[in-house]
Structure formats: structure tokens, C-alpha cells
From Swiss-Prot:
UniProt EC number: 2.8.1.13
Site (Interaction with tRNA): 126, 333
Disulphide bridges: 101-193
Family: Belongs to the MnmA/TRMU family.
Protein name: tRNA-specific 2-thiouridylase MnmA
GO BP terms: tRNA wobble position uridine thiolation
GO-annotated molecular function: ATP binding; tRNA binding; tRNA-uridine 2-sulfurtransferase activity
Entry's localization field: Cytoplasm
PANTHER family xrefs: MITOCHONDRIAL TRNA-SPECIFIC 2-THIOURIDYLASE 1, TRNA 5-METHYLAMINOMETHYL-2-THIOURIDYLATE -METHYLTRANSFERASE
Keyword Zinc-finger tagged: no
Start and end residues of each stretch annotated as Interaction with tRNA: 143-145
Annotated residues for binding of ATP: 6-13, 32, 125
Amino acid sequence: MRVLVAMSGGVDSSVAAARMVAAGHDVVGVHLALSSAPGTLRTGSRGCCSKEDAGDARRVADVLGIPFYVWDFADRFKEDVIDDFVESYARGETPNPCVRCNERIKFSALASRALALGFDALATGHYARLADGRLRRAVDHDKDQSYVLAVLTAEQLRHAVFPIGDTPKAQIREEAARLGLAVADKADSHDICFIPSGDTKAFLGARIGVRRGNVVDAAGTVLAEHDGVHGFTIGQRKGLGIPGPGPDGSPRYVTGIDAQTGTVHVGDVADLEVTSLQGDAPVFTSGVAPTGPLECVVQVRAHGGVADAVAELRGDTLEVSLRTPLRGVAPGQTLVLYRRDPAGDEVLASATIRATH
């Protein structure tokens, strides 16, 4: 099988490539250049996809004895990930750029090019598993990335390979060391790769500008003025610019954002609880939409907890009733449905949250 391996320059994708080679496949490595600006997309050990990372990936490819290329996806990345991120925050939403990158770059633009060039599959260093075409959580639950892959269609999954999903991270590092890969001890990336400083508010402010509005409490009392709803997210407690806690001394949190009026609503922690969710643009990983209610568990953050729920497709909307309330759920977040399974929870579907109740 001809396999293209997306090599970020980190230990995970490096071991993924090594395993594909060891399995006897015809392997080619590719690193995605995602920034057209001078320098890198990150500073220090933060982020990913820098020139240093490309060099690390090339050195791993040399050790493995496989061809290696750098492909420029900077324009596509800016349009489909960065611009989408900025526009979503301007609408008062809270997007996950890693979800968008997987959906629109790695498993769309990159995978399409790979197939057009005659490759049979695209392998990545994601912590997830595929069994009989079904996407499941990784063995290492702390590193599991099935959430950010849940937007993939059945056709995209058919051409995907996740070689390290059955192995804990510590063992991946040990394997890299045994193979003599210099990235064995390389630090993991955590930050948004296109925000080098880690200051999301400043990044957004530089692109959206000042759009003043008010911060109000449940009674409609104006507590403060702000420079734009992009500086807030549901559940936020710090940096609200308001004069202290509520009348009863309890902390106040962002409970709602109205981008049209520029109003940020604050309340107490109880106001953050939701019992139902509505999501649009649903994707069912099996390729078949359900005809009735689905018993499932729901996850709304990449490394968040889960809640038991019942989901039902009504038209183009995925409606979810939670058996246990969730807190701080924001429009724009990705909603992922799982089926509990001792062999590894199976991803059933994903959608973009549009409303909560």
C-alpha cells in the first residue's frame, strides 16, 4: 500500500511513519507549510509547523530512508482555519481550530492531493483507532484525539490510518528512542499554532478591531463596557472588567454573548448549566444517519468530560437531551457523540453547537 504520512516533526507522527515503514508499505513523508510569513508559527516549544519542525521531520525521514517533501498549504490554511477562527469569535462563538484543520486541511485538501497522486492512504500521528471503519478512542485516554477527528466522513476515514492509537504515549517515546529518532524527547505542542504568544484576545483584537458593547447582569444592569465580544467565551470568569463578585459575593461568569448588540451577559455558576443542545452540519462517521433516537454520551471539549444523553436528528439539526447537565457550553464548539464500548468508545457523530438550553 502506498501511504503518505503527515509528519509534523513531533514524536507521534515520526513513530507513525516508522510503523508504516516497518509494516512494509511504500511510504512518503510530507510536512505542511502553513504560514507564508517569515519565521515560524510558534515560539520556543509551543505550537507546531515551524521551520524547525520541518527540519526535524526531514531528519526523521532520512533515518527511516523514505522520501520527504514540504507542501505549501499556507493560503488554504489561512482561509479555512485562521479566517474561520476569527470570524467565528466575531460572531460570539468559541471554535476549535484543530477540528477545522483536520476537517478542511489534513483530511480534505491534503488527503485529496494524496489520492490524486496515487496514494492509497493518509497516515497521521493522531491518538485514535479505526476498527472496521469505525472511529474509536485511543488506548491512551489522556492523549485521545478522537474528538478532533469526529468531523471526518466515512469516505475520509476509509483512507485514513492512525498507527499509534493502540499505544500509550510513554511507549511511543520509548519506541522513538529505540529507533534512534532525535525527536524522542521533544516536547508536545499545546498552543494554537498560529497564535505564537498564546494571547488569543490580542490576536483577535488586531484582526477584528474595537467593537464596543456592554457587560450586563441578569437584571440588565450595565456593569462595564468592553472592546468586543471576541474577548469573551461562555463560562469565562476572569478578565471580565467588572467591579467584583455578585451581590451575594459569588463569582460571576459569562453566561451569554449577543454579537449583534455587542452585549455580554454575566451571571452565577448555576446559569451556566444546560440540559439540551442543538447542533448543525452533523456528520455521522458511519455514513448513515440514524432514523430514531440515539443513546449516547456527549463531549463538547477536546479534553472535557462526558455526559449521558439522547440524540435525535430532526431535519438538518442534531438535537441532544442531556441526562446530566453540562456547564459552560458555547456556540461554535464541536459536539461529539460516542457509544460506550469496553473495546473503546466509538464515535457516532459530530455537529457544531448553535444553541443551548
